[in-house]
């Protein structure tokens, strides 16, 4: 039997279960900044459930805690400090200016 007629077989990979990102003793609260900061991107956005590997209930509680921390000014709404930094100076024209009337 040639290769084109053989049934397709998937190669078996070893499956290693990852540890849950939130332990049973962790309390999801707006004051627990070490826990909350793990679920926020560099821009300050809330990461999705698929990225966080959380259950629906955990993701909902994390989202509420992050929003409460933002309202109480414990977290910024946006994290774009790089927006106001200038890396290069922009050359400006220093010659005489003429107006068109």
From Swiss-Prot:
What does the UniProt entry say about where the protein is found? Plastid, Chloroplast
Keyword Plastid among UniProt keywords? yes
For this UniProt record, the keywords arranged alphabetically read as follows: Chloroplast, Plastid, Ribonucleoprotein, Ribosomal protein, RNA-binding, rRNA-binding
A family per Pfam: Ribosomal_S18
What GO terms in the biological process aspect are recorded for it?
translation
> Which portions of the chain have biased composition (kind: Basic residues)?
1-19
InterPro entries, A to Z? Ribosomal_bS18, Ribosomal_bS18_CS, Ribosomal_bS18_sf
What Gene Ontology molecular function terms does this protein carry? small ribosomal subunit rRNA binding; structural constituent of ribosome
Q: Does the keyword Repeat apply?
A: no
Q: Kindly give the Gene3D superfamilies that the UniProt entry links to this protein.
A: Ribosomal protein S18
Sorted alphabetically, the Gene Ontology cellular component annotations on this record are: chloroplast; mitochondrial small ribosomal subunit
The disulfides recorded in the entry are none
Instruction: Name the segments for region: Disordered.
Output: 1-23
Regarding protein family, the annotation reads: Belongs to the bacterial ribosomal protein bS18 family.
Quote the subunit structure annotation. Part of the 30S ribosomal subunit.
Q: Which PANTHER family match?
A: 30S RIBOSOMAL PROTEIN S18, SMALL RIBOSOMAL SUBUNIT PROTEIN BS18M
Put simply, this protein is called Small ribosomal subunit protein bS18c
What lineage is on file? Eukaryota, Viridiplantae, Streptophyta, Embryophyta, Tracheophyta
Write the gene name: rps18
């Amino acid at each position: 039997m040639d290769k084109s007629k053989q049934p397709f077989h998937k190669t078996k990979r070893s499956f290693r279960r990852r540890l849950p990102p939130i332990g049973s003793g962790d309390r999801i609260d707006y004051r627990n900044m070490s826990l909350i900061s793990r679920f926020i991107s560099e821009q300050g956005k809330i990461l999705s459930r698929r990225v966080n590997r959380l259950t629906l209930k955990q993701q909902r509680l994390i989202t509420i805690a992050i929003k409460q921390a933002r309202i109480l000014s414990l977290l910024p709404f946006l994290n774009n400090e790089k927006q106001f930094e200038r890396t290069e100076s922009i050359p400006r024209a220093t010659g005489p200016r003429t107006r068109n009337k």
